[in-house]
Structure formats: structure tokens, C-alpha cells
């Protein structure tokens, strides 16, 4: 009986090894990178993105900042670019890039923490972000909310954590229901 179990295990192990694809230095796996597009010098940075399309799958331009429960600062407009944002969006999409603009937390200390603690305010933020994504038909959004960590202090995280998780769940559901993506950068 024992030799039978050993035989079965040996055959299973041999089968597993035979189905593995060996590494091949001549054909390394393709790297797929996500990149952020800084909100300065678009004229210089956009051609850099376009020159690396074989590497980049999705791009997150720093174009927005959450400034309140229902308000988002348009950093692209504030940058005084001469090219309308719609043309830049078309150019990025024409290159088959997944467009996930970055939205930062541009609120003063403890503002976001207080907003996320209120379910009604949290829902308003979700709806405001979703409306932005739908307005420009973005593929989704990239959250880069770090102010609560850097300005509010690490000790605030214990209180904020359950509200942050509820916010991420609510936003991801709202976006996924529209076929949109959510990328989250957190400290």
C-alpha cells in the first residue's frame, strides 16, 4: 500500500514537472508597466510615454485633486496647457493606453478623515469621482490619497482605517458597475 502511494506521488510530481515551461533567456516575459504622467512639462513627458508604448500598459496623469466632499480641482486647467485636455485624452487613447488619471487628496489636515467618517459625505465623494470618470470616459481612476498619512499623523490610521476600507469598497463597486477600474496608491 505504501509503495503504491509513493508511486502515485512520483507520477504526479513527474507530470507536474513535465507541464512547467522552462525559463528561456532568449524569450524573457514581457514587462508591463504602469506609469504616472507628471503635471508639469506635458510637452516633454507625453512624447516619452509614446516612445515607450511597448512597455507601458496604463498611464496615470496627475490631473486632479480632491478639495472637498463634492469638489475636485482640475490641475490640468491650472497648468495653463495650450492643448485642450480632450486632445490629450484622445492622443493617449489612440495609443491604446488604459487611462487612469490620478486624483490626490488636496485637503487640509484631517478633512478627508472627517469626510470619510460620515457615510453621506463618503458617498458624495464616491459620486463626485465617478462623475469625473464618466464625464471624460476614462478607463478608471488612480487614487493617490496620502495626506491623511503624511499630515494627519500615523496615529490617526487606527480610526481612519475602517472608513478608508468602506470608501474603497464603495468606490470600487461604483466604478466596476460602470465597467471602470480603480487603482489605489497608499502609504
Role assignments for model-derived ranges:
Residues 10-18:
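Bacterial N-terminal signal peptides
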Residues 30-38, 165-187:
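Aromatic-lined carbohydrate-recognition surfaces of secreted/lumenal glycan-active proteins
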Residues 117-141, 163, 167-170, 174:
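An active-site-proximal structural segment forming one wall of the substrate-binding cleft
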Residues 26-131:
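Glycan-recognition patch characteristic of GH18 chitinases/ENGases
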Residues 19-27:
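Sec-dependent signal peptide cleavage junction
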Residues 63, 126-159:
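Active-site groove signature of glycoside hydrolases
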Residues 1-8:
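Bacterial N-terminal signal peptides that target proteins for export
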Residues 95, 136, 177-179:
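Helix C-cap/helix->beta junction micro-motif
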